[in-house]
Amino acid sequence: MKPQVYHVDAFTSQPFRGNSAGVVFPADNLSEAQMQLIARELGHSETAFLLHSDDSDVRIRYFTPTVEVPICGHATVAAHYVRAKVLGLGNCTIWQTSLAGKHRVTIEKHNDDYRISLEQGTPGFEPPLEGETRAAIINALHLTEDDILPGLPIQVATTGHSKVMIPLKPEVDIDALSPDLNALTAISKKIGCNGFFPFQIRPGKNETDGRMFSPAIGIVEDPVTGNANGPMGAWLVHHNVLPHDGNVLRVKGHQGRALGRDGMIEVTVTIRDNQPEKVTISGTAVILFHAEWAIEL
């Protein structure tokens, strides 16, 4: 069977919104070099290749147009959405393996559609970025210290992939941000973190609006980012920013509006001793089209 190639918009139920990904299923007969060529040809920020696995339900490899990466949140949602549709799955929990390890994925079926949930890695936090580094980040975003939520740090947070959390006051016009990309690239090299995630909390709601800039790895702005919204949820618990019941915090993370690709990620943080213990990101997707690879590979 020739590989089937799918164009999927993830973290949205509306076509041409959310974050697009390529999905190739099945991909067992493809070499690594062929996967890289296909990812380059499709041109998505990430393309997911679904493979047989001996120690889990499915193995996924992720490629940008230039390099293989360990895992990708929106491409994972896209991949499992396609797999569930093709196989006609019902409600189930499965395990996937990737270069990032083994992860639990929950698939929920609602009215012939699917909601995909991915359990991310263990939350972690680096020391706050202070002094010249903090000032450089604020300047690179063309903000001032007065735009930052008072009493909270600019800090690298991770649930497997580190991102810089930059909490903004709600009155800041986040859609108007136009960062100095060269400056952000230089800061990335200095701190060893490629993603900058300014975000703000919607007043009176457990909802946020964010944007994600990663110029150091060739992504000027990512539309909707699982590997940013997940750590953000953990960061919000770590600093006790939003109210919760001591067991779970649920946050809706909105992103992509400034690009005309608005989407939403549901972030669920399991809490122990007032600290984040586990983070799960959830979302749906929409398949725009799929095709069979026409040439012999």
UniProtKB/Swiss-Prot annotation:
GO BP: biosynthetic process
Q: Which Gene3D superfamilies does its entry note?
A: Diaminopimelate Epimerase, Chain A, domain 1 (3.10.310.10)
Enzyme Commission identifier(s): 5.1.-.-
Does Isomerase count among this protein's keywords? yes
Residues in the active site?
46
Query: Could you tell me one molecular function GO term of this UniProt entry?
Result: protein homodimerization activity
| Alphabetic keyword roster | Isomerase
Q: Does the keyword Zinc apply?
A: no
Q: What does UniProt give as GO cellular component?
A: cytoplasm
Top EC category: isomerase
Q: Quote the InterPro entries the UniProt record gives.
A: Phenazine_PhzF-like (IPR003719)
User: Known NCBIfam families for this protein?
Assistant: PhzF_family, PRK10281.1
Give the similarity note: Belongs to the PhzF family.
Oligomeric state and interaction partners are given as:
Homodimer and homotetramer.
Q: What is this protein called?
A: Uncharacterized isomerase YddE
> Where does this protein come from, organism-wise?
Escherichia coli (strain K12)
Lineage, uppermost ranks: Bacteria, Pseudomonadati, Pseudomonadota, Gammaproteobacteria, Enterobacterales
UniProt lists the gene as: yddE
